[in-house]
Amino acid sequence: MARIAGVNIPTAKRVPIALTYITGIGNTSAKAICEAVGIDATRRVNELSDAEILAIREHIDANYSVEGDLRREVQMNIKRLMDLGCYRGLRHRRNLPVRGQRTHTNARTRKGPAKAIAGKKK
């Protein structure tokens, strides 16, 4: 298995598909990486030489924020919003939907399981 950005990518899959196993790299980015490094998108990971894997690794390190760094960056952005006390930060702090969804009904994923209220059944 090839190891790129701390992730073991599957060897039997095509290179662009295998690169999407890295957090922060989607389909478009994976195809752009293959094009930039000069690797055919139809090749499989087990067909790559060590030099090609090294080229992919260096390109990702130089141009993309991936895995732990990306997660840390997202968490810092959320923390910044919460510290500012803006509306989005308050919604994060209260574990409510941030992007304007309704909360009268639904939003159970964000709010958690429904809390039982005594005397509700009538």
UniProtKB/Swiss-Prot annotation:
GO terms for biological process: translation. Pfam families: Ribosomal_S13. The keyword tRNA-binding applies. It comes from the Bacteria. One of its GO terms (cellular component) is small ribosomal subunit. GO terms for molecular function: rRNA binding; structural constituent of ribosome; tRNA binding. Residues 98-122 are annotated as: Disordered. Part of the 30S ribosomal subunit. Forms a loose heterodimer with protein S19. Forms two bridges to the 50S subunit in the 70S ribosome. This is Small ribosomal subunit protein uS13. It comes from Ruegeria pomeroyi (strain ATCC 700808 / DSM 15171 / DSS-3). The lineage of its organism: Bacteria, Pseudomonadati, Pseudomonadota, Alphaproteobacteria, Rhodobacterales.
